[in-house]
Amino acid sequence: MGFDPENQSISSVGQVVGDSSSGGITAEKEPLLKENHSPENYSVLAAIPPFLFPALGALLFGYEIGATSCAIMSLKSPTLSGISWYDLSSVDVGIITSGSLYGALIGSIVAFSVADIIGRRKELILAAFLYLVGAIVTVVAPVFSILIIGRVTYGMGIGLTMHAAPMYIAETAPSQIRGRMISLKEFSTVLGMVGGYGIGSLWITVISGWRYMYATILPFPVIMGTGMCWLPASPRWLLLRALQGQGNGENLQQAAIRSLCRLRGSVIADSAAEQVNEILAELSLVGEDKEATFGELFRGKCLKALTIAGGLVLFQQITGQPSVLYYAPSILQTAGFSAAADATRISILLGLLKLVMTGVSVIVIDRVGRRPLLLCGVSGMVISLFLLGSYYMFYKNVPAVAVAALLLYVGCYQLSFGPIGWLMISEIFPLKLRGRGISLAVLVNFGANALVTFAFSPLKELLGAGILFCAFGVICVVSLFFIYYIVPETKGLTLEEIEAKCL
């Protein structure tokens, strides 16, 4: 018989006491939500795989961004495309470029329905399969329509990955390095982007080079899927299933203990059961023992979490990030880079800067905290956006202003919104609504990205680049107030403590 949430109580120190005769869950009496909990023990070697294989999915996302910019140039070449339908219209190019984005939106919608049923691990296995199928279809595509099917399929893998990867990492990483691990996922995305630009530049002068660009990554989804098959399910997801009666409680608890031992290494062999009992008690205390309804997303602590997560990923996009990167080559050209100075090389330069600044964020995030990095980074973005606006309105004969503003923007974004947006959405939602909540946040992210990308050109023609960048600067100022008054500090807290203290 499964664990019965009705047949439990909270003891005087806040512990779950189940009826063992019903095959339920019992927990030892331990202090709950301690003010100063001791750091979680873990083995460094054991902590690497639960990060590495989900992060491969993020790397594949970044690679797609970099490689596609090169693939478009290859596809449009009469001599190098190797196809008869190379004469692509601007609409065709837009469909190819945004095909993965539409797929990601579909993947986010699918994740909303199935994430809490199949779990984070199986979702990442499915994402790896979609990556592989999408890449293969793209590589062999004989006609335009098949190419788009491949792009959309690959994009569905992106949507599932960007939903499940931060969740799996957040739920399996020790609290003292959780921020660093999830920020490293963003580092993987940027690394993939730089790799995509680099590999794309190698194949761009080869006939049918665009096929080789996508073929290069075929081993990675296989590695990702194999690795996720080997890794255990998230112990918190297993305990959520137990608390909500979605299986035999005792068996699920034992599976969670085994999972935790594998994720943290032999150093916690003697304390794994105790840690699982503490997590169970904390989950029960904050109301995770009742199955969530859709309406709960928009009430109480869940609404607050949705406001924080949705606001961060919305500001992540509407503060101009897609537009600034889109406009980067022309900005650098005004500073003396020739038009033939290869957009690829320019993109690699920016990608390396993004990589360095994301690395800085990874190093300091669990020491400094989320809020200080957000406030400092976004303040730098405000300055850079107003500088860009001023350049286009008043200082067009001083290209150094544009270059400095561009580099400042990219660096500050990667120090703040870039990694911390994904980190916060992975840790702020209550466990029982984490799957659905993150899927909505991912949907907002990709939707806002699409909106800003598509609206940029007409708005630039209507308002002018100077006014548009200043408008982004004003939105950035609004985001500073949002961060200061709404976004909590989660540094060093367990996921259960975040739910109890920050929501």
From Swiss-Prot:
Can you quote a single GO CC term?
vacuolar membrane
Cite the InterPro entries for this sequence: MFS_dom (IPR020846), MFS_sugar_transport-like (IPR005828), MFS_Sugar_Transporter (IPR050820), MFS_trans_sf (IPR036259), Sugar/inositol_transpt (IPR003663), Sugar_transporter_CS (IPR005829)
Listed GO MF terms: fructose transmembrane transporter activity
Origin, by domain of life?
Eukaryota
The record ties this protein, via Pfam families, to: Sugar_tr
Where is composition skewed (Low complexity) in this entry? 8-23
Q: Which region ranges are annotated with the description Disordered?
A: 1-23
| Listed GO biological process terms | D-glucose transmembrane transport; fructose transmembrane transport; positive regulation of flower development; response to nematode; seed germination
Fetch the PROSITE patterns from UniProt.
MFS, SUGAR_TRANSPORT_1
**Membrane topology reported for the UniProt record:** Multi-pass membrane protein
| Subcellular localization | Membrane
Major location category of this protein: membrane
Q: Which UniProt keywords apply?
A: Membrane, Sugar transport, Transmembrane, Transmembrane helix, Transport
* Transmembrane intervals: 51-73, 95-115, 129-149, 152-172, 190-210, 213-233, 305-325, 346-366, 374-394, 405-425, 437-457, 467-487
Family recorded in the similarity comment? Belongs to the major facilitator superfamily. Sugar transporter (TC 2.A.1.1) family.
PANTHER family named in the record: D-XYLOSE-PROTON SYMPORTER-LIKE 1, D-XYLOSE-PROTON SYMPORTER-LIKE 2
What protein name is recorded for this chain? Answer: D-xylose-proton symporter-like 1
Q: Provide the taxonomic classification.
A: Eukaryota, Viridiplantae, Streptophyta, Embryophyta, Tracheophyta
